[in-house]
Amino acid sequence: MQKNYLELIKKVRERSNPDLVQMTKMYSETLSGSKLFENKSIEYSDVSIYIKESMKGVAPSYTMNSKVAANKVEAHLKKSHGNLVDFERQGSVMTNTHILKENDVDLVQITNKSSEFDHKGLEKALNNTSVLKTEEILNLKKHKENFSPYQGNQIDDLKYVRLKSELVLSSTYKTVDIEKENSIYVKVTEPERDIDVVTATYYKSVDFMKTNDKSRKGIQIYNKKTGKINDVDYPFLSIERINVKDIISNRRLKNMIRFLKNIKYDCPHIENKGSIRSFHINAICYNIDVKKYEDLHYLDLVSILYQELTNIISNKSYRDNIKSVDGCEYIFEFDCAKKLIEIEFLSQELDSIIADLHNQSLLVG
């Protein structure tokens, strides 16, 4: 049975462009037309409009206000912490792959009193300099020479930053949740946005020490419940890679990420959180060979995604080798069965949309 696309269009517009701002065209709809659907009138069908609206980014003015809200929270914390904390951003807002209901913007406060350090990786790299450039060798040696053990207690520092931030934010904003393990939730009222404040320490990876490229710096988030730091993440590298690959793909990568997020959100069989998160959708889309879709019309991107999900479901070897955008973990290593159930639901949604496109093409042909 065909979906109620008018209702779906209404919902996706409400969550991505609540202020009804005039939106610009996507790169993938400025070409002459779809290779699969040569009749241009198909683009005015309800199913095509739903696809287009689901691929578009959130209105720029709305996204800008999300950043303004994060800046306001940062200003309060900066006044309290001074120069002892650096501030960064992570999340899908920084790549413009967010949808309104998953308006993912994290304010990361990072202690600069200490950092984690990949000592073993550094020594291993310096013992095999034949594969390194001269500049990389010099950078590694400099990091080794400049290293000195931290005399304080890193966990105590992070605990103090977290506690002080809880006090500052609770006295500034009406709605604050300090019970979350990895972050402090803050509801900013003007502009009205939800902000998560994460407390972390830097992690100096070998790639960072070789290049001094800030995007190669990792972070380890302080967990309030365990009183420990979590495994290393590379959010800044993920942001850079998605932004760069989107340019290489002629702006199509982000179209696919947003589309799959919206399809997941509209799927009645998948919970809002679920096993497949933004993290996994980013990785799935990022993994697709750019050459397969870099010049395609937006309607053809649906088939590309369907083929990818089908391959993930049927080919274990292929599935097991899909890594996160930062390249640090295999996304189907854990909870694979649950994730595959949701991938199957997403695949069915795409199959249904493709069938409706073909049926509509016959009607207007």
Swiss-Prot record:
Catalytic reactions on record: 2 GTP = 3',3'-c-di-GMP + 2 diphosphate
Using the UniProt record, name the top-level EC class of this enzyme in a single word.
Answer: transferase
Question: What family does the Swiss-Prot or TrEMBL record give for this protein?
Answer: Belongs to the CD-NTase family. E subfamily.
Q: What is the lineage of its organism?
A: Bacteria, Pseudomonadati, Bacteroidota, Flavobacteriia, Flavobacteriales
Species in which this protein is naturally found:
Flavobacteriaceae sp. genome_bin_11
Q: What further note is attached to this protein's record?
A: Bacteria with this enzyme do not have other c-di-GMP synthase enzymes (no GGDEF or EAL-domain containing proteins), suggesting this second messenger has been co-opted for CBASS signaling via STING activation.
Task: Indicate what this protein is called per its UniProt record.
Answer: c-di-GMP synthase
Which E.C. number(s) belong to this protein?
2.7.7.65
Question: One of this protein's GO BP terms?
Answer: defense response to virus
MF term (GO), any: GTP binding
Q: Briefly state the protein's biological role.
A: Cyclic nucleotide synthase (second messenger synthase) of a CBASS antivirus system. CBASS (cyclic oligonucleotide-based antiphage signaling system) provides immunity against bacteriophage. The CD-NTase protein synthesizes cyclic nucleotides in response to infection; these serve as specific second messenger signals. The signals activate a diverse range of effectors, leading to bacterial cell death and thus abortive phage infection. A type I-D(GG) CBASS system.
Q: What keywords appear on the UniProt entry?
A: Antiviral defense, GTP-binding, Nucleotide-binding, Nucleotidyltransferase, Transferase
